């Protein structure tokens, strides 16, 4: 589990006690190729996310059929980024804190959420404003969390994977 993400895995089980939480460590294609999923969520928390064309096609079809994908990574690249028309910008701050917040009033914190030491100020430098709902921004107002409606489902993309770990 990336970045000590076992905490979010454990929390998911208590937050969704009536739901099945499954940890998979296989390539996307191997998981989705022979199965039909409906109303499910697929979560990725990685340093960088760059699936190949085959995995991208399976992921796009999975979401188009009404499922959701949450990806939190410093950068999202390759075929998936091209298909969703997004680009990420990477910047590393070794001694500076990063402050992030949500856009939605019901989730927004007055002071935001701060992460210290060894931080990345990564954000979406390009996205299609007609397709995207901005969900979060950095203290510098850079977009770091967004939702893209795709078919019957959604992609939730985030550039602060350390926020979902026990790293800080």
Language-model region placement:
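A short linear-motif detector with a strong N-terminal bias
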Residues: 2, 22, 48-50, 112-115, ...
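A broad, low-specificity signal for short, low-complexity segments enriched in glycine/proline
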Residues: 2-5, 30-33, 116-122
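Alpha-helical transmembrane signal-anchor/signal-peptide segments
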Residues: 1-13
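Extracytoplasmic/periplasmic, Sec-exported soluble proteins
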Residues: 4, 51-54, 167-168
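Catalytic beta-strand/loop cores that center a nucleophilic Ser/Cys/Thr
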Residues: 100-159, 163-167
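Glycine-centered flexibility sites
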Residues: 4, 66, 151-153
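Membrane-embedded segments
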Residues: 10, 20-103, 145
């Amino acid at each position: 589990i990336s970045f000590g993400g076992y905490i979010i895995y454990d929390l998911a089980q208590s937050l969704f006690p009536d739901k099945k939480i499954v940890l998979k460590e296989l390539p996307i294609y191997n998981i989705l190729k022979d199965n039909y999923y409906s109303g499910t969520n697929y979560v990725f928390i990685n340093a960088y996310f760059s699936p190949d064309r085959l995995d991208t096609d399976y992921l796009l079809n999975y979401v188009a059929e009404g499922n959701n994908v949450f990806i939190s990574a410093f950068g999202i690249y390759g075929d998936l980024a091209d298909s969703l028309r997004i680009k990420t910008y990477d910047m590393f701050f070794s001694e500076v804190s990063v402050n992030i917040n949500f856009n939605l009033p019901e989730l927004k914190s007055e002071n935001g959420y701060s992460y210290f030491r060894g931080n990345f100020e990564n954000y979406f430098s390009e996205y299609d404003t007609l397709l995207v709902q901005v969900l979060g921004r950095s203290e510098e107002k850079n977009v770091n969390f967004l939702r893209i409606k795709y078919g019957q489902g959604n992609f939730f993309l985030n550039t602060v994977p350390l926020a979902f770990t026990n790293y800080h």
